[in-house]
């Protein structure tokens, strides 16, 4: 009996993985279309999100691991509805932000602003948050304030 249950679990996991691959492909298509229709010129990160530095400060001080930085983060659904607009102190490397934001911060200096087009798997994933639905593709503006 145990052996049969293990096979069922394996097939359930495989089905879930296949579904997530399909959903990731669909998210990539939506994000690519957004980027192609926007006037901003984006680059694609190895993890699958798109980014564009829209304000470059004169500072050359990159953000260091453990450094506390003042952030302004605006998160919208990719189709335009603003979900969140917050300012707070973030400790670089604390792990509380999704991949698309933390990887973008590593490319920024104090005073910079970056636009991010994030498919769900680089944003808040399959679980979402209290205000962001699971599998949400997002447009994010992050500013490291001075």
Positions of predicted regions on the chain:
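Cross-family detector of peptidyl-prolyl cis-trans isomerase
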Residues: 1-146
């Amino acid at each position: 009996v145990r052996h049969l249950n293990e096979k069922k679990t394996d097939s359930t996991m495989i089905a879930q993985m296949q579904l997530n691959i399909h959903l990731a492909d669909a998210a990539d298509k939506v994000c690519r279309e957004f980027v192609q229709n926007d006037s901003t010129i984006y680059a694609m990160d190895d993890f699958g999100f798109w980014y564009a530095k829209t304000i470059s400060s004169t500072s050359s001080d990159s953000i260091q691991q453990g450094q506390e930085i003042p952030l302004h983060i605006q998160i919208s659904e990719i189709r335009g509805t603003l979900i969140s607009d917050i300012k707070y102190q973030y400790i670089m490397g604390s792990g509380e932000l999704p991949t698309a934001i933390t990887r973008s911060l590593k490319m920024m200096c104090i005073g910079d602003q970056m636009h991010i087009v994030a498919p769900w798997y680089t944003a808040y994933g399959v679980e979402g948050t209290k205000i962001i639905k699971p599998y949400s593709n997002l447009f994010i503006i992050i500013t490291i304030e001075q």
